[in-house]
């Protein structure tokens, strides 16, 4: 009689990272990441515009607010985007509920991204994703917002709407990275195409996700786990992220200096950062002295009391080159952590309806229409108009 002894197969345990692209800008960012073949990430797109969803390269699509918008878009009205996300919140949660980490990317200043992104972030914060691959317990989803602000040529109306959207989104995300589209002019030239410029902005999101995933899944001498990432990013407010890659003499220093001077981000400095995540990647020829030089160059930029988490990974495709990725959190000089949950802190403000400009209640709107000449009233302000009868692509031409 033979006894067949076999070891049980170990389950594949790894953090589940989800990226949700909200609205047109968010959907474009997801398309660019899919085209760049970013691995280890679950992609989802959510939009009120059915035509935009049809063109998406993403397999997982959420049509926001079918009853509210009929698939015709939000008409640049954030309240419509918010209502559409609230209508579809159950479907949204089906896609994100088992995530350990959630990236929400959107463009601020329009309707869907500005209104829906905070709703999704709030749902993620209130949810408690079961971490089944550890001790059975409930744990919140670590949520990161990566959003853009409008170009200057988009007009004065979109910027205040974008600022209100950022203020609302920051209530619910652990970390927020803001990319002003206007900063694209810092790195563009006269021959840079419009499409290529936006890809540069989308690359910031790509850098952030790759920097996190590489530290946890790439082979290396110093690997980090998800708990390390969470320590630096949980409840940390505004953040900046950068990456640099160099070869030749002093490649480590050059890569580090490029990483800490990202020209796309929103006039932020690492000086007051409370948490720093450093990822140094190189081929088999990367030396100990190079790792030391790159890490110390980044450390020079931050307070000595900052919580610095460091990882070094190997990638044979990086032979002859060194890449340094830096994520600095808590750069607004505050840590949102407190004994009171951010959700309970914001309950009072939630009692009052969050009001965007150009989406007044009917009573306020009537007074506005009486006191302003007709030609000064924006089409978007006419809440009672049949906005949903006009396709989104036509409304955008107005």
From Swiss-Prot:
Keywords: Cell cycle, Cell division, Cytoplasm, GTP-binding, Nucleotide-binding, Septation. Residues 333-381 are annotated as: Disordered. It holds the Pfam family FtsZ_C. Gene3D superfamilies: Tubulin/FtsZ, C-terminal domain, Tubulin/FtsZ, GTPase domain. It comes from the Bacteria. It is found in: Cytoplasm. This is Cell division protein FtsZ. GO terms for cellular component: cell division site; cytoplasm. InterPro entries: Cell_div_FtsZ (IPR000158), Cell_div_FtsZ_CS (IPR020805), FtsZ/CetZ (IPR045061), FtsZ_C (IPR024757), Tub_FtsZ_C (IPR008280), Tubulin/FtsZ-like_C (IPR037103), Tubulin/FtsZ_2-layer-sand-dom (IPR018316), Tubulin/FtsZ_GTPase_sf (IPR036525). HAMAP family: FtsZ. CDD domains: FtsZ_type1. One of its GO terms (biological process) is protein polymerization. SUPFAM superfamilies: Tubulin C-terminal domain-like, Tubulin nucleotide-binding domain-like. Its main location: cytoplasm. Belongs to the FtsZ family. Homodimer. Polymerizes to form a dynamic ring structure in a strictly GTP-dependent manner. Interacts directly with several other division proteins. Essential cell division protein that forms a contractile ring structure (Z ring) at the future cell division site. The regulation of the ring assembly controls the timing and the location of cell division. One of the functions of the FtsZ ring is to recruit other cell division proteins to the septum to produce a new cell wall between the dividing cells. Binds GTP and shows GTPase activity. GTP binds at residues 24-28, 111-113, 154, 158, 202.
């Amino acid at each position: 009689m033979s006894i067949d002894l076999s070891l049980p197969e170990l389950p594949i345990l790894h953090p589940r990272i989800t990226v949700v692209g909200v609205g047109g800008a968010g959907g474009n960012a997801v398309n660019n990441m899919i085209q760049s073949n970013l691995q280890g990430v679950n992609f989802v797109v959510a939009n009120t515009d059915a035509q935009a969803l049809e063109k998406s390269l993403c397999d997982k699509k959420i049509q926001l607010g079918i009853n509210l918008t009929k698939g015709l878009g939000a008409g640049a009205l954030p309240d419509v985007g918010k209502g559409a996300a609230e209508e579809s919140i159950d479907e949204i949660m089906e896609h994100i509920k088992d995530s350990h980490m959630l990236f929400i990317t959107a463009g601020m200043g329009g309707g869907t991204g500005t209104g829906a992104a905070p709703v999704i972030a709030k749902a993620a914060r209130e949810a408690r994703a079961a971490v089944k691959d550890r001790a059975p317990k409930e744990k919140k989803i670590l949520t990161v917002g990566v959003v853009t602000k409008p170009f200057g040529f988009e007009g004065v109306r979109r910027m205040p709407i974008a600022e209100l959207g950022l203020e609302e989104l920051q209530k619910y995300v652990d970390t927020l990275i803001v990319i002003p589209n206007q900063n694209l002019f810092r790195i563009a030239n006269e021959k840079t195409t419009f499409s290529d410029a936006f890809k540069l902005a989308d690359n910031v999101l790509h850098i952030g996700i790759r920097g996190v995933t590489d530290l946890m899944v790439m082979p290396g001498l110093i690997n980090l786990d998800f708990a390390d990432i969470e320590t630096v990013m949980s409840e940390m407010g505004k953040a900046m992220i950068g990456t640099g890659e160099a070869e030749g003499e002093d490649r480590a220093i050059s890569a580090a200096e490029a990483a800490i001077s990202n020209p796309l981000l929103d006039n932020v400095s690492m000086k007051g950062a409370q948490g720093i995540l450093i990822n140094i990647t190189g081929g088999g020829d990367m030396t100990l002295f190079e790792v030391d030089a790159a890490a110390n160059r980044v450390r020079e930029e931050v307070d000595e009391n900052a919580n610095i988490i460091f990882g070094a990974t190997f990638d044979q495709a990086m032979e002859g080159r060194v890449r340094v990725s830096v994520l600095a959190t808590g750069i607004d000089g505050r840590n949102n952590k407190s004994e009171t949950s951010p959700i309970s802190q914001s309950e009072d403000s939630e009692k009052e309806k969050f009001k965007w400009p150009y989406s007044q209640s009917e009573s306020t709107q009537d007074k506005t229409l009486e006191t302003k000449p007709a030609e000064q009233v924006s089409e978007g302000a006419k809440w009672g108009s049949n906005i949903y009868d006009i396709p989104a692509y036509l409304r955008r031409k107005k």
